[in-house]
Amino acid sequence: MKTLVLLSALFLLAFQVQADPIQNTDEETNTEVQPQEEDQAVSVSFGNPEGSDLQEESLRDLGCYCRKRGCTRRERINGTCRKGHLMYTLCCL
């Protein structure tokens, strides 16, 4: 189960690296409209519905958050998350 979560996180990180140039142009246009948008906590699930409860619980135990501007010093990048059409960095303690 941990291997699946790790592989999913690596896949999402690779996806973020490819989508990063597009995200930068979106952030530049959105900064004028929403200059002080706060970080938002979002639940993330992977795979089939049977294992999703365990995976969501693991992310909560790790203390994962979707951050717009990057992780804090105590956190590490663990992938990406999406809310609507915006991509965020998934940061875990």
From Swiss-Prot:
Pfam families with a match to the protein in the record: Defensin_1, Defensin_propep
Bias kind Acidic residues: ranges: 25-40
Recorded superkingdom: Eukaryota
Propeptide part(s) removed at maturation, as residue ranges: 20-58
Primary location: secreted
Cleaved signal peptide residues: 1-19
Residue pairs linked by disulfide bridges in the UniProt entry: 64-92, 66-81, 71-91
SMART domains, sorted: Defensin_propep, DEFSN
Entry keywords, A to Z: Antibiotic, Antimicrobial, Defensin, Disulfide bond, Secreted, Signal
One term under GO cellular component: extracellular space
Location of region: Disordered: 24-55
Signal as UniProt keyword: yes
Any one GO biological process: defense response to bacterium
Function recorded in the entry: May have microbicidal activities.
Family affiliation: Belongs to the alpha-defensin family.
PANTHER family for the chain: ALPHA-DEFENSIN 1, ALPHA-DEFENSIN 1-RELATED
Name by which UniProt lists this protein: Alpha-defensin 26
Encoding gene (name): Defa26
